């Protein structure tokens, strides 16, 4: 969704930098396919070691390519280092917009990243700042039960998984065999802290909203603030392979 959105809102030439492991490869492939299909150009794709303390050589290659955007998919702990070096090398002042997959700005780790994360745009299925009453209650519950922890995508995924199991077994009358359970949850829908959720009756994949988010400071803390919604999204990687 990040690729679609950015292609429609000004970005024409984007370099990708991803961690060199399977999820990074998938993210790179999906972004390139979607962005180029929308008319954009990806002149350079870089893969960095999964545990990489120095992004300077890669960022220099990014600068040399003169893109108007940099898409990153790097685990949150490493992402903070990359973003700091992005700012230290002045790329934030060079006209290169930093964008990425949502888990690089993990809600629970976001404040540790500091101001280098400000302005980063991401696309993801959850933000702790989602304004629904259900999410506000969820965020407060997680905070109270976990010594101040902020709810994140791991937490909401666990919540939805438990909800699905509970409702599935309730619908089967206690039967837990595979056929009964799968039959019960096909097409199921519910209101999650992340927003509306459902199970595709054909593929049994999750269908949910994807939110465009921007890191902003609110009341002294950093949050992924939603500014646009793409509703009822199916698995984007599978869709890109069709």
What spans do the regions from the language model cover?
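Extracytosolic ligand-binding ectodomains
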Residues: 1-242
